[in-house]
Structures are given as structure tokens and as C-alpha cells.
Amino acid sequence: MQEKTKRIIKEDIEAVRAYSDCFDVEMPDLDENGEVIGLPAPYPREVAGTVRSGYRIYDLAKKAKERGWPIQNPILGRNTAEETYGESQEMYAYADKFDETLFHFVHAEATRHIDPLKGRELINQSRGKGGITPIGEREFIAMGGGSKHPVRINATGDTPHLSIINALIAGFDGTDIGPVIHVHFGGRGIHDYKTKVVNGYKAIQICAENNIFVQLDSHKHLNNIGGTDGMALAMCLLSEGLAVHAGLPWELSAIQMNVAGINIYADLAVMRAFRKACHSKSIIAVPETFQNPPGNLVAEAAHFSRMAVTAKLGGADFYRPKAAESVGIPTGDSMGQAIWGTEDVFGHVVNPDIQSPVIDAREAEIIDEALAVLEATLHLEGLTLEAMTDDFWKQWSDEALIDLIVAAGKAGVLDSQRAAGWDLKRHVVVNRDKDGITRYVKGYTPLGVDASRCAQSDEDVEVHVEKAPTRPEKIVLATVGADAHVNGINVIREAFQDAGYDVVYLRGMNLPESVAEVAAEVGADAVGVSNLLGLGMELFPRVSKRLEELGLRDKMVVCAGGRIAEKEEEHRQFEEKIQKEGSAFMGMDGFFGPGSSPEDCVKIIGDMINAKKA
């Protein structure tokens, strides 16, 4: 019983012990004979008066299919169990208005991204932000969390299997792992790519053996970093191949998908392609990120209603309502209003089962690109969806399949424009065409993949090419803390490079002091740091402090971006403070929040540099 889980614990016992010590929670250990102790029984298992199981979530997916519209999957997790439980009760009150059972996504603390054995310092500087803590997960369930509404925790990062063991002990019905196949948001992380994939596979095995519902992989995250629909489908299918080896029941497997609400035919095509190709029984539709919705909850509701319509028409099993996209973690009341509004959309939109040759053609195009990527990854020819049965994936051992995946990532076969894994080959360039579809720019399709089978843009696209600086000014850019969200700072990097600056780019997850020291070493004129987890007040001043210690603060422009505070109400207070007082209270010369123009950033910081030199 639980043989794979026990084997994984034995193999990674030092990391398990580091997790226990780092987060002050009791974890499984080994007795004097080297056998695992302290591991709870698999689900179904009663925890805090409720029988927990991933099948509670699958039962909701079946309900969605029967009635014809998605179950809502709101995201809400605060730093403590008490806060999370209290805000959740306010959110649940709205669902009670129409007797709806939710699939509650309890967002975890950002430290989940980091290996506790190798990244303790990063963890320590990022505690208490991004969501609920590991000990808070256990306390939340003990308080009654998940008793009516099934819950899942997110476990993305370097060591998802450790987070999932904690969730199993706590009593969460589900979790997420994806993206397994690509580096989450392109962050640097601690590990090499193979370790990332291996740890993802360990997480899948634990879910399979303990009946945990799992969001296996994510079309959404690949889209967010410039992955095409076809590439995302290929990666999700590779994750399903690993799931076959893990023995994961398809009823407990879900794929997360973007819906953009820009082109309904395109959204329907991609949802149908995934439904046709994937064996996972559930699709979780999520409103596309990075569309810069209005910074107002009422106006934002209209923005997200477009995605809710698509989710219903596309037959999603679950849908994540959004509130306060521009400010991080919303209040329970704001999320409750988003749930209420979304349910109104679901209840007043008729699904006419839209059929069109345009949808059919796009669906076929997505599937063909995915098959081309898989052929290049697996060294096959003439691959079809019909051939990809469970037995198909068993022709390789799990180790051999992982080796093929890793080799494809390092060769540029599995590629997306803004992924920044340090040992992955980058080549592709994409364009978001006027019809809302992301396609490759001609000449920049994935390496080793038949270009004729990759959707390519017909638009006139100017490709950003890194070139030698034409100006003497130098700027260091990085995210600080346990933050792997590099999409925004990548855009800023390109803007400064296009303007001729010499850019030193440190990617994601850096200590503030390290950024300052690099700036000193290279003789930078400016430093730009970002954190989207609400750690601005804790981390940004440390950059300036270290520069002061080095005697360089007065010689450098130091600016920041992202979110100063993670919670809706706190972020609003800081925005007002910046408008009245400026950003000096954070030790910054300027702050560029969500929605800032890259061109404005370049101009304003350039003017600041000139003023320093004057």
C-alpha cells in the first residue's frame, strides 16, 4: 500500500526533513529500520469530520456535464488559516444564494516554488505572501475548510511532491502540478530541467496512489509565456504519458486551459482540440491573464464575462471566476460578487452547439501541430491521436520517456517564447494575430519540428533581436524573492534593449542584496526589480539598503514594478500613498505597477539617469 509514495519519501528524505524544519510542520520520516512512518492513509479518508477524496471533485465535473455549464473554481487563499477561512465564508455566502457547490482553489504561499533543501534563504525572505502557509493548510481544514466545498491547493514549483504530501496530510481533495513539462512562468528556479520533470512525475505518482484530484498540466501557463495552442497540447499530452506510467485514473486528471474571449471560434476550436486529444476527464477554463482589464471591480466584471461565455459554450467542466486581477488576492466579498456575476452569465447564455468549418479547420491545425511536436520529441513518424492509447506510452519506460522530454526541451523542440529556464534552448518567436490566435513568426518555428505543420503568422512582424547596445547607460533587471513571474520584466527588458541600453538580465528569483551587488559589479546606472507576490515593502528597500552600504545608492536610479501588497485592500492603500507621496517610502525612485507602459518606463527612467548625471 502506497509503495510509490513511500519510495519517493525514502529517496528524498533529506528534502522532506528540510520541508518539515523550514515550515514547522510534522512530515513523514523513517524509523530505525528505514521504513516510512507518519504517512496517512490514502483517500478516501475522513479528515475533520469530512471524507476527503479527489472523486469529490470529479463528481462536480459530472454534474457540470449533466447540467450543461461549468462548476465555478474560485481562487482564494490568505496568509493564515483564520484569514482564509473568514474570507472564504464571505465568498461561500454568495454561492449559497443559488445553492451552488464550488471547487475552491486555496492559493498557497509563494515559497512552494522553492526546494527547501537548496533554497532556504529564498524561502525565508518570502514567507507569508502569495497565499496560505503549509501549517495554515492544515489549520484551515481543521477549522472546517472543504467540508461543503471540495478544495485543492497549488503545488507548482521545484518540489511539488513535497507540497502534495503536506496537502494529503492536511486533507485537501486536489492539487495542481502543471506545467510539468515546461518551467513555470520561465522562472529560474533552483533545479535543472530534468530534475524539474522528475519531481513533477513524483508528484503525479503520489496523486495517483492517494486518489488526489490533480490539475495535471496547463495550456494556460504555456500561453502566458508565448506558447502556441499546438505546442501546449503537445506538452499536455506528454504529461498524460507520464500519468499513464504513474497509474493516474483519468477521472482524477484535469487540464487547465486559457479562454481569451477575443475570438469565440478560436476559443471553441482549442477547447475542442484538447477535449478530442486528451484523456483527462476534466477541463478547467481560466480567463486569460495579461489582457490588462480595467482597474475597477465593476468594469472588470464586464471584461471577464466574455471568458465566462466562452467557457460555457466550450463545454468546460470548471471555470475560474476572476476578481481584482490588477491587485492580487481579492477579498472574499469581491470574489463572491465575481461568482454571482458569473453564475448569472451561465444561467442566461444558451449553448446552441456552434458549428463552423472555421472552427473545424483551426481544431485540426492545433492537433496537427501537436502531433508534429510529439513526432520530433519521440522520434516517430505518422503519429495519430488514435494511436496514443495507454499502451502507446508504455512502449517506453518512465525513465526513457523523461529522457526524451528533457532532450526535446534542451534541443528547442519543446519551446515557448518567454520561457527562461537556464538550461533550455530558446528559438521560437510568436505573434498574437488580429484574430486573437498566437502563431509563429515565419522562420522562428520550433527547432526540429516540421515548419509546414506549425501555424505561422501572415502579418508583418518586427522581430525583437538582441543587438549590441548603442548607448552607454547600463541597467540591471530582475525579479526578487520567490517570484517566478518573469513575463512582465521580460517585456521591460526588450523595451530597454530596443532603446539601445546595455541590459543585464538576472531572470527570476533573486535575493535583493544579490541584485544590488551585481549592479555594483557591472557599474550599472539603474536597477529595476519586480515582485508580483505583494512583497514590495519587504524586498524593495533591501536593494537600496545594500547599495547604500556599498556607497552607490546616490549614483544609481532604483525603480520597481509589480505589486507592493498582495491583498486587494492593502494594494489600494499603497497606490493612494504613492500618488500622494511618491515611492521613496519603499526606497525606490519610481514605481511602475500593473498596466504601466514599457515606453513610459524607458523614458522616465532615462530622464532619471540623465538627472543623476547632471
UniProtKB/Swiss-Prot annotation:
> Top EC class per UniProt?
isomerase
What this protein needs as a cofactor is: adenosylcob(III)alamin; cob(II)alamin
* The reaction(s) this protein catalyses: 2-methyleneglutarate = 2-methylene-3-methylsuccinate
Q: What induces it?
A: By nicotinate.
**Its Gene Ontology biological processes?**
nicotinate catabolic process
Q: Name one GO molecular function term.
A: 2-methyleneglutarate mutase activity
Q: Which residues form a coiled coil?
A: none
Q: Which residues are listed for adenosylcob(III)alamin binding in this entry? A: H485
Q: What is the effect of changing H464Q?
A: No effect on activity
The cross-references to InterPro entries, in alphabetical order and at most eight, read: Acid_CoA_mut_C, Cbl-dep_enz_cat, Cobalamin-bd, Cobalamin-bd_sf
Known regulation of activity: Inhibited by intrinsic factor and iodoacetic acid. Competitively inhibited by itaconate, mesaconate, succinate, 1-methyl-1,2-trans-clycopropane, dicarboxylate and L-malate. Non-competitively inhibited by glutaconate and 1-methyl-1,2-cis-cyclopropanedicarboxylate. Not inhibited by acrylate or by the chelating agents alpha,alpha-dipyridyl or EDTA. Not activated by Fe(2+), Mg(2+), Mn(2+) or Ca(2+). Unaffected by K(+), Na(+), NH4(+), Rb(+) or Li(+).
How does this chain assemble? Homotetramer.
Identify this protein by name: 2-methyleneglutarate mutase
Species of provenance:
Eubacterium barkeri
Q: Gene that codes for this?
A: mgm
